[in-house]
Amino acid sequence: MKIPKRIAQTLMNSLKGGVVPRVGLPYVTVGRKAEIDALLHDVDIIADGGASFRFIVGQYGSGKSFLLQTIRNYVMAKNFVVVDADLSPERRLQGTRGQGLATYKELVRNMSTKTKPEGGALSLILDRWISGVQQAAVEASGLSVTDPALSPLVEKRISAVIASLSEMVHGFDFARLLTLYYRAHLSGDDETKAKVLKWFRGEYATKTEARQELGVNIVITDDDWYEYLKLFACFLKQANYAGMLILIDELVNIYKIPNAITRQYNYEKILTMYNDTMQGKAQHLGIILCGTPQCMEDPRRGVYSYEALRSRLAEGRFSGTHKDLLSPVIRLQPLTPEEMLILVEKLADIHAGLYEYEQIVAQQDMVDFIEIEFGRIGADSHITPREVIRDFIEVLDIVYQNRDVKVRELLSGGDFAYAQNAVQEESADGLFAEFEL
């Protein structure tokens, strides 16, 4: 398996550090076929003008973020725009100190397309939209780009897009700013273009500032930022993209909010998103939220503590142990030992290619490693890919640098320390979940 060294190094560094790489995921993807297929079905619905909403639930290290990145890369290749953010104490869905707006800013900052997958694609999208409208007008009229008669035709097409947005909540102001951007683009006014981009990114703190610089008497706030994402989704379809996917990870940070009322406001925002997508109010929009079982199911602090969400999301009496990937909640099951073995085989190949050595970890060594990992107490239900990956990369690093060390000796020795179990991590967090100042 030949992998560019830049990608191989990124994979090794990210995976050993316990984080999901942005590049090279296909080289290490194993399992999760049913979950990926279910999410890709949602993608088809979004492209047809529908909307979707999913929770991905799994323990720390079970592959939630990995699955998000896999879907992210796939939909960008299918001409979707993706915005993603990790929640934190400073980034929530709703807050009294701008935490909701901070999440919006992070989402827009990370706006990505196939040609700009690292984020910051907003200006590229707007410029591409204008160029696309101009090209369509040229093809329809037969006029040249420099012909003065082309400008009214382009204006007419721009107006048609803007009119379709004006009917939505905050659509009039959104459309007005698109018009400002288009006219600034025509006149080469980079300063105005920068101001419009600043507004779209949610960086105007007051209405007064926005009115003085752009002539609009509105700014994006904690209360209405989600409405602007719905506007973006509809605009992006008009700009010849397939739709927009919103990816929000670390939902546990809402679970950890000490104030019950603040938590309820955040769950209310989730309910709004859920209802919009399920009832058909949102179009060309997909939303995926990721969290742990505890942050979903805890009856006092979790998502299910909000009765309106619990009644919509809780499993029915027929589900039992069977998987239902058509429900809004996708629960990640542990990878099988066979899938884990395939994963470590891929890691061994990548490691050998990166450091240019002949494979020194035998197939039987890998089998022994997996047997030992799954032989730990509670591993059948609690072991996660993150633990296995970090342990195995550590084994590879040690035997590569110490050629006299045998894998079997290393695994049976007392010096080798396994990665911390995901359940232990979650339990440690839970010790302080109720602590308030």
Predicted regions and their residues:
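P-loop NTPase nucleotide-binding core
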Residues: 55, 62, 66-239, 400-402
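C-terminal alpha-helical "lid" subdomain
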Residues: 179-198, 319-323, 333-437
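Conserved phosphate/pyrophosphate-binding and hydrolysis machinery centered on Walker-type P-loop NTPases
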Residues: 25, 29-33, 61, 97, ...
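A short, basic N-terminal segment
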Residues: 1-52, 150-151, 405-437
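Amphipathic alpha-helical segments in well-structured domains
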Residues: 36, 68, 100-104, 263-270
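The catalytic "switch" region of P-loop NTPases
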Residues: 2-7, 193-361
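Gly/Ser/Thr-rich loops at beta-strand to alpha-helix junctions
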Residues: 60-65, 252-253, 384
